[in-house]
């Protein structure tokens, strides 16, 4: 079954509206004008409870909003209303320490001793909160000093338990009972000893607290002090026990029992509407003789020493409290700053390490690619030069040709080749730089999560190389097709000339063998051949194959075969002049074609297409000059080899995508990009120096040219060089006649065709292997890049963790600074407390000095004590007389009351009689009776005034001392009779 309060709360909670919420909000904001407006215009009730059990009126008392509380009281708010917890506004104001609100409520006729749901009064709340001003205000409004809550605790017990020394002193001065006990038998002194407050213990001992009182367990205050372990408290208790004497102890016990009985009786009667008795003065211990006075002086000196010691201890404690927070704060701040610096340093080191690792990875990648390219270039160049310069000729007569091979022109050719190798190395370096730029671009793109773009550059390069390879193959096919058409154009002539030349060589074989030696013939023709070679070089013959050398070789064959050396020389000179003029024109045309092309690929196309035409022009020129069919067939064979070697060089160039491909093409002697080397010219010079007058010398020279061309062509490490060498040796050894290769160009072309197909297959295989290697390198590079990216992400995560740690350290530093500020505030509060304690000590010193000055001699004290005893005896006699006179006065008062009633009835009767005629005798009798009664009333009034004056005198005496309960009852009756008399009048 619900209680009435619960129902009331539920009803009010249901009626709670927005206006009530606005009023509550205005009180929270302490908006006095808003509160007044809402109450006046809306008609709101300030004491209405919300669903949580609080109202605007109670909130104003709790928050200390004195202005809002004044407005609500002016609007007629119920002062005695309680909130959901059972507190009224007076309890809340005392609990939260708002003396202004407390004064307003007390002036508004709020009951000062009303209890809350736990039995606490406003003084209990003020004692628990330690509010000295609120306690003084309640004492000034005659609050009961010894009310008990449900646990039997009084305000003094609560103040002692909370160690509020000043509040205990105030309550003792206002007459609070020192030795009252709660339901557990504990006194204020026991709780002060338990709380460890020597100041509170000292105040209670000075107020008359007894050490012999025990609690429900039989433990006294000394036991509580021993449990605390405070030496100062134990010293105070021992001194108080030693100082107390039996007479004084009995007197204190009597006074304590009387005060306890009075407090209990007053607590039992506090519900009755009776007047409050006068407050009891604090008990004091009288000094019976000089010995007690001497002991008092000694005690005061000891107390002074204790106070000085306490002052020094407080000063030391203050200094220690002042230094400890500063040192702790400084150490914590230094440690936090050091941590922040370490974290920042670690962060900088991690960033530097990340940057250095990134740079190292990039440098290693670039260096690796550079070293690989340089290794390939160097190994290829060294192998090429070793194959070109280190191999010795294997054919007969090589020893005779060696001194002539080491000519100044050959050294110049080697120097030019070295310069070209250096130029190609520089170009290779530039290409490597471009590749490095492309790799950096790919790395930047990969960081933007576009990994697909990393394959763009290699795929484009691969497609371009494939297209270039297909184009070169088409050029090679066209060149072969044009050559076949050229060969098919003169089959009878070639065949006929072949048979004629072969027959002539067969007929004149003995003459050739018996003729001059090979060195002599070489010496005869070397000067002319060298001259022709120098003219070809001066004429800008870069990019042209050694057709001129073949012409100069084939030209002296017919004159020498005829046996007339002089005639042969003349004819040779004439034919060389014609051939030189014709070839000069062809070379000029070729040079103009090479200069007109700016791009390397275009130059390659031009060189590939013009070469067969040039071969045809050369054949026509030689035919017009009167050359034989044998010379033409030799040129055609040379042209076939030229075309095959050129196509092979183009294929090799298509395979090589780096700077090595240029080196291969230049070493073989095929320059279709506009940069023509003189390697083939060197071969032509070698061929020219090896010309013989007989068919055997021509065959050996052709064989040497074939071997040299095959050696220069097969520069790839795929075994093509060995294949060409074996093919040449097979042709040389398998031919019974040394001139068979010259006389059968169709078979040589077929052999070259097969050789070229073999080389093409080898180059395609090398291309596929190169593609696989490039793909593997690309995958490895991607793996390295992925590892570097993962490492970068790991470092990024570490960096983020370090940043978070730095933020945490910064926040910790901020909290430490905040705590330091709070510690400073606490230090300031402690300093203020110390200052307050210092002022208290000064006041104690002044009081001590005043007590010293107020001490009187023992005789004067004895005389004053006897005078006081006589005065007490007289007062007791006067009180007994007053009681007797009071009884008499009470009877007289009742008589006066009866007489007053009779006078009143007589007056009424007179009024009635005045309206009706009566006899004169009756009228006179009545008048005489009235006069007598008036005189009697005057006499009684004089006596009553004397009684009242005596009562006032005794009341003044009672204010200064103790008034008994019976005297108080008599005085109450007298006052009641006075009120009745006033009403009767």
UniProtKB/Swiss-Prot annotation:
Residues 291-488 form a coiled coil. Expressed in vestibular hair bundles. One of its GO terms (molecular function) is actin binding. InterPro entries: Ankyrin_rpt, Ankyrin_rpt-contain_sf, RAI14/UACA. GO terms for cellular component: plasma membrane; stereocilium. Disruption phenotype: Deficient mice exhibit progressive hearing loss. Loss of Ankrd24 induces morphological changes in hair bundles, early postnatal hair bundles are warped. Stereocilia of deficient mice show diminished recovery of auditory function after noise damage and increased susceptibility to overstimulation of the hair bund. GO terms for biological process: auditory receptor cell stereocilium organization; sensory perception of sound. Component of the stereocilia rootlet in hair cells of inner ear. Bridges the apical plasma membrane with the lower rootlet and maintains normal distribution of TRIOBP, thereby reinforcing stereocilia insertion points and organizing rootlets for hearing with long-term resilience. Homodimer. Interacts (via C-terminal domain) with TRIOBP (via C-terminal domain) isoform 4; recruits TRIOBP isoform 4 to stereocilia rootlets. This is Ankyrin repeat domain-containing protein 24.
